Each structure stands twice: as structure tokens, then as C-alpha cells.
Amino acid sequence: MIKLLFNVSPELYREYRQPILEALRRRNIEAMTGLPGDIAPEEIDYVIHATGGPVDDFGVFTKARAVLSLWAGVEKIVGNRTLTQPLCRMVESGLRQGMVEWVVAHTLRAHLGMDRYVCQKPLAWEQHVPPLATDRSVTVLGLGELGSAAALTLAGLGFRVTGWARRAREIAGVRCLAGADRLPEALATAEILVAILPETPDTINLLDAERLALLPAGSCILNAGRGSLIDDTALIAALDRGQVTNATLDVFRTEPLSANHPFWSHPGVTISPHVAAATRVQSASDAIADNIERAESGAPLLHLVDRALSY
């Protein structure tokens, strides 16, 4: 029997404990679980972690074979110097599907100009015929598991999709660019810009005033990566001068977004309260169980975090 420590809040423990146990049983693995203090640290085989968990010294888990994150983002833990165990980020089908649906919905909303009809004056019959998707350029920043899935789906709808990442990628139907020197090229054609990048030292304020100025006039931005990707002040300035017509933001530097933040009152900002890619309990439990099964059988862990890259 393996021993799992849930380094999570009591609420998350109640939500995930039984689904993960059931997912493990389907794989013929029996487990004992507990919160910090329930099981001796030196007896723990795996740590299931979420931001805000009470333990931040992972050095006590001398037997632990891996730390398995419940969330896709690991920027809050990756720099922890006591964490010497393999760290795995969450990648699961529900997370991927949720992100694709959110990106497609808001890309189509921007592409079709739906806001003008939702907000139009009563009795105003004003026709605005948008171009077809084949004549609309979309750039996706970040081509990991989620970004690649979104880019592939948008290309399947006919959009002219450019993808940009730190390292070279190949995605059917997507023009892929890589490296800092190709970022201006990726931004220059982005009538709709979709950001799905993680937070790393290289991505903080990636979209600053200088880079926002490279976007085509009247572009739209969707940010479902991390709030730190965009300089808030520079974005508001770009909206005010018409460089950007709308920004749909799912992530923010501080969450929940403070009540006095100017994003709330800006007519060009749509606030989506971090719902683009929520972790689904059942599919996430299967993903955790899959990785534990792999480790128990001696197979390589999936979705290992590269500490040098911070994701």
C-alpha cells in the first residue's frame, strides 16, 4: 500500500481524496491518504500539491518519489529549494478541452464582433459583416499542451494561425515561430492575440508597451496564461488609443482582482474570473493515478517540470 500526502486545503482534500483513491483502485493500487500531520513525513510515497498547501519544506519527504501538482501552473512552487523530488504539472483532458472551448468562444466573439450586437442601442439595425475566418489572422503565444490544442482547433476552423513558442514546434496548419527574435513577427500579424504562456522570468511583462505597439491597430487580446504576461498600465494605454479594441482577461497579477482595479471599469476589458481551464476532478484524478501507476511500474513520469525553464 502506498501513502499519499495531500498538501492542499481541507476543502480540496475532501473534494479529491475519494476520486483519486477510486482512480488508483481501478489500476489495482491501494493507497492510504492524509493531510500534513496524519502520516509521518518519512513514510510518504507521493505528495499531491496545490498552491496554498500548508507544507513548504519538501526536504522532510525523504522517501517521496514525486510531487504531483493539481494545477497546470507551477510558478509558485518551482523555485522552492527544498523541492528535490520530481515535480509534475497537471495536464489532463478536461483542462485541455476547457481551454480550447474558452479560446474558440472568445476568438469567435472577437472575430464576429459580437459585442456590438450585445451592447447595441435599442432599435438600431446596424449590419457589420465580418471577414471569413480564412481572412483573419490569429496568433497564439505558447505552444505547450494547451496552446497547441487551441492553435490546432483554430486552424481547423479556417483561421490563419501563427503560433509562437520559446522552442521550435510543428503543428499541422499552423505557422510556427520560435525564439525571442521571432516574437515581433508573430505579433505583427495578430489581429487576435491569444496568450497561453506560463509565468517564467522570461515571460513577465512580455507584452509591454513596446510589444503591444507591434500589434495591428484595432487588434483584440485574449489572455488565459498568466496575469504577469501583460503590463497592465501599458495595456490600458493601448486600449485608450485604439491600438487594442478589446482585451478579454482570464488571469490577473493578483486574484481575485481588487475592486478598485481599472480593468473593472474600462469599456474595452472583459473580465473572465480564471475559468478558462479549470481542473476537473474526475479527469485530474485519472491523470494523478496514471502518473503514480507509471512510477510504481518503473516507467518515466509524465509532464515533468524542467526547473531551468520554470515549467
Tell where the protein language model's regions lie, with residue ranges:
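N-terminal glycine-/charge-rich "phosphate-binding" loop or analogous flexible N-terminal tail
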Residues: M1-Y46
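Short acidic low-complexity segments
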Residues: A31-E43, D56-D57, V174-T189
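Rossmann-like dinucleotide-binding domain for NAD(H)/NADP(H)
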Residues: G218, A224-Y311
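NAD(P)-binding Rossmann-fold cofactor-contacting core
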Residues: G156-G173
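Short, well-ordered coil/turn residues at beta-beta hairpins
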Residues: A50, L70, I196-E199, A224, ...
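Glycine-rich NAD(P)-binding loop of Rossmann-like domains
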Residues: R116-A149, C176
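Rossmann-like adenosine-cofactor binding region
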Residues: A168-P262
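Phosphate/diphosphate ligand-binding glycine-rich loop within oxidoreductases
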Residues: D45-V118
